[in-house]
Design a protein with these regions (language model features):
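Conserved C-terminal guanine-recognition region of P-loop GTPase G domains, centered on the G4
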Residues: 49-52, 75-145
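Canonical P-loop GTPase G-domain recognition
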Residues: 122-176
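Helical mechanochemical/support elements of P-loop NTPase systems and associated helical scaffolds
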Residues: 37, 41, 56, 68, ...
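Residue-level signature of catalytic and energy-coupling elements of molecular machines
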Residues: 22-23, 41, 59, 76, ...
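Flexible inter-domain linker/hinge segments
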Residues: 179-180
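Conserved nucleotide-binding/hydrolysis micro-motifs of P-loop NTPases
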Residues: 29, 38, 62-63, 94-98, ...
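Conserved G1/Walker A P-loop phosphate-binding module
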Residues: 1-65, 83
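Signal for well-folded cores of large energy- and translation-related assemblies
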Residues: 27, 65, 80-81, 108, ...
């Protein structure tokens, strides 16, 4: 899925986890966000520049799983399997962590590079949830976890930096040593 960009990232997550808000913050777009499942059915893409790199962002439909029973699940699953994103940023609603982590685990099982954008941390704290991101990262096999409140723009720059750092690390891990 290369269209003259340096990186392609996929935004995945449950409905209403804030994927489109993250997409808008990253790309400067103004995609309409809605507070109901099924708002985004097709994938949308946009671009942004960061640290001299042109990065394509693909906003996948919100889905609870990759079981491929609904149109949203099919679109999301097919892109993850065939679109070859450099990294999948799974946007997770911190106030509903358990339900959201099911999709994270399914995407990890596809053996794709994953970052977790732990969104709506302000709402989670309001209802008394304290999430240890280091512990969560360890529990997910070392997947980077970035705290954010996308609606307020908090954590967006950290997410951009994490995407670059993580994709550079993944690239080094995949590059074989030269044969001498």
């Amino acid at each position: 899925m290369r269209r003259n960009t340096d990186l392609t990232i996929a935004l995945a997550g449950n409905p209403n986890a804030g994927k489109t808000t993250v997409f808008n913050r990253l790309t400067g777009s103004r995609q309409h966000t809605g507070n109901w499942p099924g708002k985004t059915i097709e994938r949308k893409s946009g671009r942004y520049k960061h640290a001299g790199m042109l990065i394509e962002v693909v906003d996948l439909p919100g889905t609870y799983s990759l079981a491929a029973y609904s149109e949203e699940e099919i679109v999301a699953r097919d892109f993850l399997l065939e679109g070859q994103p450099d990294v999948v940023v799974v946007v997770v609603d911190a106030s509903n962590l358990e339900r959201n982590l099911y999709l994270v685990v399914q995407i990890l099982e596809l053996q794709l590079p994953v970052l977790v954008a732990l969104n709506m941390t302000d709402m989670a704290e309001t209802i008394g949830f304290e999430i240890d991101t280091d512990n969560l990262s360890d529990g997910l096999g070392g997947v980077p976890v970035i705290r954010m409140v996308a609606a307020r723009g908090r954590g967006i720059e950290e997410l951009k930096e994490a995407i670059l750092l993580y994709t550079k690390q993944q690239s080094k891990e995949r590059t074989p040593d030269p044969i001498v």
